[in-house]
């Protein structure tokens, strides 16, 4: 008889535990991750300018490599991206995205350096020496966030 009294509690506990475990399955984590191109994504953060070593060795400006200045979107919260092929591999816990812009976009958006912005574009994974961050975003548009 005691079994019948406690059975509903055990069922409730089992349901709660199963629910909690369900939220951390690989499928649910993947559902929270972003997709690579051709999917357009929207990210928020602050744009900063950084200088990195470029040609010929991509190692040291002091030792003769050309300086390469890039724009980076610094995210408040890290993101993950689901692998789509051999180049666009899985990425996890990324908080900095290198922005890829056309020359006219650098002129148009220069006033937004240091500002909180929303950026839309297509993600891809680094694959050359000019790619200084793990993730890059071929940028469609940048909009300044309204003041809080």
Regions found by a protein language model. Name each.
Residues 1-14:
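Bacterial N-terminal signal peptides that target proteins for export
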Residues 19-28:
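C-terminal segment of classical bacterial N-terminal signal peptides
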Residues 29-39:
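Short boundary/loop segments of OB/S1/cold-shock single-stranded nucleic-acid-binding domains
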Residues 38-69, 79, 121:
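Structural detector for short beta-strands of small beta-barrel domains
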Residues 75, 127-148:
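OB-fold/S1-family single-stranded nucleic acid-binding modules
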Residues 83-108:
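Beta-strand/loop nucleic-acid-binding surfaces
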Residues 104-119:
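Short nucleic-acid-contacting surface segments enriched for D/E, G, S/T with interspersed K/R
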């Amino acid at each position: 008889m005691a079994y019948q009294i406690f059975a509903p509690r055990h069922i409730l506990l089992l349901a709660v535990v199963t629910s909690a475990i369900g939220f951390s399955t690989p499928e649910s984590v993947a559902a929270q991750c972003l997709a690579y191109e051709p999917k357009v994504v929207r990210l928020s953060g602050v744009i900063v300018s950084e200088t990195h070593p470029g040609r010929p060795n991509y190692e040291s400006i002091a030792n003769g490599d050309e300086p390469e200045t890039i724009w980076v979107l610094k995210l408040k919260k890290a993101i993950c991206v689901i692998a789509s092929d051999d180049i666009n591999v899985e990425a996890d816990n990324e908080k900095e995205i290198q922005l890829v812009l056309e020359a006219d976009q650098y002129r148009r958006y220069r006033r937004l350096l240091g500002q909180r912005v929303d950026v839309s574009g297509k993600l891809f994974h680094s694959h050359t020496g000019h790619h200084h961050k793990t993730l890059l975003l071929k940028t469609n548009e940048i909009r300044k966030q309204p003041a809080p």
